[in-house]
Design a protein with these regions (language model features):
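Sequence-level preference for short, compositionally simple segments enriched
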Residues: 30, 68, 74, 148, ...
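Glycine-rich, aromatic-bearing surface loops/beta-hairpins
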Residues: 147-183
């Protein structure tokens, strides 16, 4: 004979599990389909763009400030985005993205410090981009995952929030404000 326990015993555990799992759910890019202006990454990153950003550790403390001077060039569905980072401590870095625009708003990209291929998709005014980055820290290099979300505010301004994690543990967050140079 099968014996069922009273819901009073297992319902609180089930409810807590559902709440915890819901907290792990991420945004869905499709929810931005009706948002305007429409983001065409190849158009936005064609030419000069400057960004100002911060990195916050998992407690929320700002531990790094930086600017990024970018120059993008597109030839058909192939693009190059040349990024020059300047940090508040004077350190400088450079990353060159080689990007490909695919059908349905999908993009892929590679860079020397990116492991494998980054992939993302633009829908409405939003773009979601995921990749693994080789991050140098105190003489060691760590592979960390980035979940990047960009939101086009108007033709010139775009905001970016990126969550950085390792082994699924959130390490911090990057926030950027992009401003497209218009002649």
């Amino acid at each position: 004979m099968i014996r069922f326990e009273s819901p009073r015993r297992w319902l609180p555990t089930l409810t807590a599990s559902v709440v915890l799992l819901a907290g792990c759910a991420s945004q869905n890019i499709e929810q931005y389909a009706a948002e305007r202006p429409q983001l065409d990454l190849a158009h936005y990153f064609n030419g000069k763009v400057i960004a100002h950003g911060i990195f916050q550790d998992r407690s929320g403390q700002v531990v790094r400030r930086f600017t990024v001077d970018m120059d993008g060039r597109w030839y058909g569905n192939q693009g190059v985005l040349d990024e020059h980072f300047t940090y508040s401590d004077g350190k400088k870095e450079r990353r060159i993205w080689r990007l490909t625009k695919h059908a349905d708003g999908r993009y892929t990209g590679t860079a020397d410090d990116v492991v494998g291929t980054a992939s993302g998709r633009a829908v409405g005014n939003a773009f979601q981009w995921a990749y693994t980055l080789n991050l140098p820290v105190d003489g060691k290099v760590y592979e960390v995952q980035f979940d990047d979300w960009m939101y086009l505010i108007d033709e010139r301004v775009m905001l970016n929030r990126a969550s950085m994690s390792k082994f699924g543990i959130r390490l911090g967050e990057v926030t950027l404000s992009f401003q497209k140079h218009t002649p």
